[in-house]
Amino acid sequence: MALRLMNNQETQQTLSKETLSTITKEDMVKVFADSKRKQLKLEINENELKLAMDELNELTGMQNIKTEIDELVHLIRYYNEIGKDVLNKFSLHSIFTGNPGTGKTTVARILGKIFKALGILERGHTVETDREGLVAGFIGQTAIKTASRIDEAMGGVLFIDEAYALTEGKGSPNDFGAEAISTILKRMEDN
């Protein structure tokens, strides 16, 4: 409406309240036409997706996670088809729990490949780290070290093995795990 009024030659004169508050059909058509044009359609790489899904399905057991990921893939396809903004509709942050050797790291790697194939991630690579890879021994260095690992993982997956170890030693003046957690949470909110 504002653009229509600004482009109208008659707007050089004083406009009435009615003119300023009237929305025309053309205004609405323009707004929705513009929003349709701005919708992002993900490019899905069907070959990469099939390979990643096959790799997931070859894993022994884990039927629940396989079903969850399959349903997520179908939902992302559906949203992409109807023009919903897939990238901002989902939180891709996940927590994998389980005993050692149950495949958490393997599933995280495969999920990165699936998200890349779906066009959600640029690179789909997995950066694996643990407490030692995030926490430094001096004040102020942990945030820098953690941010560096996060930057390395951008466009892919950051997998923090035994992330609970970041909370160990809470309250100790020599423990910087809380600083790493704060840095991670801030970047998760921002990116």
Q: Residues of each region from the PLM?
A:
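Walker A/P-loop
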Residues: K89-G124, S148-M154
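Pre-Walker A (pre-P-loop) alpha-helix and adjacent loop at the N terminus of AAA/AAA+ ATPase modules
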Residues: L49-S94, K113
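Conserved Walker B
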Residues: R131-E132, E162-Y164
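Conserved C-terminal helix/linker of AAA+ ATPases
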Residues: L5-N45
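Short glycine-rich substrate-engagement loop in P-loop NTPases that contacts/grips substrate
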Residues: E122-A153, A178
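Conserved catalytic/switch belt of AAA+ P-loop NTPases
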Residues: Y164-N191
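Hydrophobic positions in the central parallel beta-sheet of the AAA+
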Residues: S94, V127-T129, L158-F159
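The conserved phosphate-sensing helix
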Residues: M1-N7, Q63
